């Protein structure tokens, strides 16, 4: 699982600037989940070959008793509890503040590695910057400038050394014996535990409410139709003997970790409840991560035909961006519709891992252009010459040509649909990248 780094500090010390630096902004997965993450952002970053998740908390007032500051403090505490590393940010220009001391008092008790970071330290002597903050009792302060990037790489590399050292590594044998990795995600009480029970069969899954979430990664191996699968813990499963207990408490961090670790995600929805923003945000995580996806609409049994039609219309309207995914109407409790659901899991995995030969891709591209050319931009019409595969899970198709920056989003979607149809890429996001050739004689007289 990707380690989680929580950025904590009083207001206006530069947490958001550091968050943007660590995630390179464009990689941010989602911001401000309504009703769930007031002033808390979740993003993904990478240092070399080591990925990580970052949580940007709101300004922390640990002694706030009520109102919005109290809510922000509660959200921050949850972020800290779900993290592997805490980066505590203070302001080098304004020096030590009483709030810093209150936050330090709280952090010393949480049992997480703490990295004390003095931001806005550009142009200042280290001894002057650090002097005030030693009294916090959190070790040597690390001086950085989030705005300019000074010291940030060294700090994050050091934090990741600690984070990855605390994670048990799977052996090569364990990795090879794993089947298709499936994450079942959804908001609480949509029936994740019931579906897990129906899939795993002989194991018992008990759902109950409990504050906090387990930090341990759990993989449950099972077979279905002679095929091996591995279920990733998404409901907060905890093994007790042969019993799996599911903590039905929604955690953004656990959901993000599970999605990024999976080969295929099953997004489970409740047919008896309206599609919520939270459902749409979880779906957005999946698309951003490029994961293969199957949607299960649970509790379909016994629904009035009019309710079924209304639910289908609601799905089509609110989850239109999931048009690449198969939707299945199931009952986990009655074990109906699960066979077709799992066949779509297999199809989505095959599509995500498909190998697309360059000659066939280029032929499909040429056919698409002959059927419908891209529009001109002024006197220039983009020329699409050839295509090759740039990656898997999700499939990436790289198209080469001239003036490709003039390609419209509408034409890009047209090409995506043509490639999907030609190569039967159902159930997986598809990325298309354009690379324009440069004219070597353009600057010569």
Curated annotation (Swiss-Prot):
Q: Which residues form a coiled coil?
A: none
Top-level taxon of origin: Bacteria
Q: Could you tell me which residue ranges the KH-like domain spans? A: 354-438
Please, one GO biological process term?
ribosome biogenesis
Residues given in the record as GTP 2 binding sites: 186-193, 233-237, 298-301
What CDD domains is this protein classified in?
Answer: EngA1, EngA2
Record keywords, A-Z: GTP-binding, Nucleotide-binding, Repeat, Ribosome biogenesis
Where do the EngA-type G domain residues begin and end?
A: 3-167, 180-353
Q: Which GO terms describe its molecular function?
A: ATP hydrolysis activity; GTP binding; ribosome binding
Instruction: Quote the SMART domains the UniProt record gives.
Output: AAA
Cross-referenced PROSITE patterns, in alphabetical order? Answer: G_ENGA (PS51712)
Database matches in Gene3D superfamilies: 3.30.300.20, P-loop containing nucleotide triphosphate hydrolases
Binding residues annotated for GTP 1, in chain numbering: 9-16, 56-60, 119-122
Q: Which InterPro entries match?
A: AAA+_ATPase, G_ENGA, GTP-bd, GTPase_Der, KH_dom-like, KH_dom-like_a/b, P-loop_NTPase, Small_GTP-bd
* Assembly mode: Associates with the 50S ribosomal subunit.
What is the documented function of this protein?
GTPase that plays an essential role in the late steps of ribosome biogenesis.
Q: Which NCBIfam families match?
A: GTPase_EngA, small_GTP
Name the HAMAP family on file: GTPase_Der
Family indicated by similarity: Belongs to the TRAFAC class TrmE-Era-EngA-EngB-Septin-like GTPase superfamily. EngA (Der) GTPase family.
Its recorded name reads: GTPase Der
Gene (UniProt): der
